[in-house]
């Protein structure tokens, strides 16, 4: 763990001491080396699945894929932000990259923590850099409104979690993840244990987000700069799923009855957010709402607590992280050229930027879960385990899949096909940097087809 954390912390002096000419090159190079070093986590040798580096930090098959995804995303975020930040003064550029690095540090500590309180502290700490990135470097003035939504939704959800964790610490005397799976849920009064169960999961359901507490997500996504959108879609939403999977182990047998309304809400959310996507005119908003739908499927897979559901959830989290991040990067390349997020104003891009259209096509297919891609593997496992739990879920999940395919194709056709608008006369050509950025998103998705057991989590 330290072989990643120490180089990550050493990125701060790199950023603040390197000369202006080499700032972006050195920070991208060093973060890419860290990302490649993080791949060494993917070999497991111990019998328990935990490979512990010290008392406070350890990795297991559930956290490793998410840790690698976090490290992989930092160089991509820095790559994506380069042209967006070039007009800014040098020290602001340095501050921006420093915020991204601090965010990665908190995320690595959150996914690697063995104490739940440490996980909680890091879970909350990720809020701060994200909030500064959205409210300082966002595009429109609504970014302050989006930041307020983001802050209050997240804090209101996670305060009950803190109370629940302190109650548990008081009862058990420990909050270590190694021992908590063997403990009993708290024996409280009639309503006490139900409230305790809800408090344990509410913070994560808001973070995922579950349909109904999702209103902060489209706002935050639309207003955030490109790096903010990427890390939000790819990793911060996955903190919710990861936290739920960690807490689920100790909430039995309460979850058996109490999870019903949440599963129904998650499945209903897939259809509702899909229908919203079909009506969207705003490019980033469409991708943000599609994230809510996918994470609803993940929430359902985790809440029914079967091995297939858990495995499908973690596969879908990883695959969705890469695919939606790629879509946000593509939306950003279009925004940097046309200065508009409205899809009608940026049609017919296939005529001008044909290679970009190829990337749009592949990313849209990854989003709609094309057969060999891991997105489909995750969705199928969750849908199958839900079907085993209740036949009726097939209607909702099947309809959700159909709508997902519809809006993904709608997204592709609206941006790439059709007549060229008259106001698009001279567009700047694409850069190698942008192609590299998208390739580095899509290559892992394609390679994971060949070795999916890297992200099967606990249950293989």
Swiss-Prot record:
Pfam family for this entry, one: Oxidored_q5_N
E.C. code: 7.1.1.2
Biological process per Gene Ontology, one example term: electron transport coupled proton transport
Positions of transmembrane segments: 20-42, 61-81, 94-113, 117-139, 148-168, 195-215, 225-245, 258-278, 285-304, 308-330, 351-371, 394-414, 436-456
Keywords tagged on the record: Electron transport, Membrane, Mitochondrion, NAD, Respiratory chain, Translocase, Transmembrane, Transmembrane helix, Transport, Ubiquinone
GO terms for cellular component: mitochondrial membrane
InterPro entries for the chain: NADH4_N, NADH_Q_OxRdtase_chainM/4, NADH_UbQ_OxRdtase, ND/Mrp_TM
Keyword NAD: yes
Subcellular location: Mitochondrion membrane
Coiled-coil ranges (or none): none
Molecular function in Gene Ontology: NADH dehydrogenase (ubiquinone) activity; ubiquinone binding
Catalytic activity of the protein: a ubiquinone + NADH + 5 H(+)(in) = a ubiquinol + NAD(+) + 4 H(+)(out)
Topology with respect to the bilayer: Multi-pass membrane protein
Top class in the EC scheme: translocase
Function: Core subunit of the mitochondrial membrane respiratory chain NADH dehydrogenase (Complex I) that is believed to belong to the minimal assembly required for catalysis. Complex I functions in the transfer of electrons from NADH to the respiratory chain. The immediate electron acceptor for the enzyme is believed to be ubiquinone.
Protein family: Belongs to the complex I subunit 4 family.
Name listed for the protein in its UniProt record: NADH-ubiquinone oxidoreductase chain 4
Annotated source species: Oncorhynchus mykiss (Rainbow trout)
Originating gene: MT-ND4
């Amino acid at each position: 763990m330290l072989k990643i954390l120490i180089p990550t912390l050493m990125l701060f002096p790199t950023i603040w001491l390197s000369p202006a000419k080499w700032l972006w090159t050195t920070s991208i190079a060093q973060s890419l080396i860290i990302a490649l070093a993080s791949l060494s986590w993917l070999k497991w040798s111990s019998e328990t699945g935990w490979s512990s580096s010290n008392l406070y930090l350890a990795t297991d098959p559930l956290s490793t894929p998410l840790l690698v995804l976090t490290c992989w995303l930092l160089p991509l975020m820095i790559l994506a932000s380069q042209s967006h930040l070039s007009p800014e003064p040098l020290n602001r550029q340095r501050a921006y990259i420093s915020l991204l690095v601090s965010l990665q540090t908190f995320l690595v500590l959150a996914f690697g923590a063995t104490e739940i309180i440490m996980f909680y502290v890091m879970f909350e700490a990720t809020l701060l850099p994200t909030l500064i990135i959205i409210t300082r470097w966002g595009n429109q003035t609504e970014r302050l409104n989006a930041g307020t939504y983001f802050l209050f939704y997240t804090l209101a959800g996670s305060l009950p979690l803190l109370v629940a964790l302190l109650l548990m610490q008081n009862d058990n005397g420990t909050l270590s993840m190694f021992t908590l799976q063997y403990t009993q849920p708290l024996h409280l009064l009639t309503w006490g244990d139900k409230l305790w169960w809800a408090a344990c999961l509410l913070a994560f359901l808001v973070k995922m987000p579950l349909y109904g507490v999702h209103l902060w997500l489209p706002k935050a996504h639309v207003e955030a700069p490109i790096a903010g959108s990427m890390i939000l879609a790819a990793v911060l939403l996955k903190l919710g799923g990861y936290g739920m999977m960690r807490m689920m182990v100790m909430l039995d047998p309460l979850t058996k009855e109490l999870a019903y309304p949440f599963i129904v809400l998650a499945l209903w959310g897939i259809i509702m957010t899909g229908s919203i996507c079909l009506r969207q005119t705003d490019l980033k908003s469409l991708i943000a709402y599609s994230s809510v739908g996918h994470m609803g499927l993940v929430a359902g897979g985790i809440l029914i607590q079967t091995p297939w559901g858990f495995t499908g959830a973690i596969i879908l989290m990883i695959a969705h992280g890469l695919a939606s991040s790629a879509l946000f990067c593509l939306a950003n390349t279009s925004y940097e050229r046309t200065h508009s997020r409205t899809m009608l104003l940026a049609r017919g891009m296939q005529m001008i930027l044909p290679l970009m259209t190829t990337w749009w096509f592949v990313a849209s297919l990854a989003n709609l879960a094309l057969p060999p891609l891991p997105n489909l593997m995750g969705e199928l496992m969750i849908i199958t385990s839900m079907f085993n739990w209740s036949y009726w879920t097939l209607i909702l999940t099947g309809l959700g899949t159909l709508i997902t395919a519809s809006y993904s194709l709608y997204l592709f056709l609206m941006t790439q096909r059709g007549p060229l608008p008259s106001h698009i006369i001279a567009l700047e050509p694409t850069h190698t940097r942008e192609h590299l950025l998208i390739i580095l998103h899509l290559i892992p998705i394609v390679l994971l087809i060949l070795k999916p057991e890297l992200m099967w989590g606990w249950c293989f």
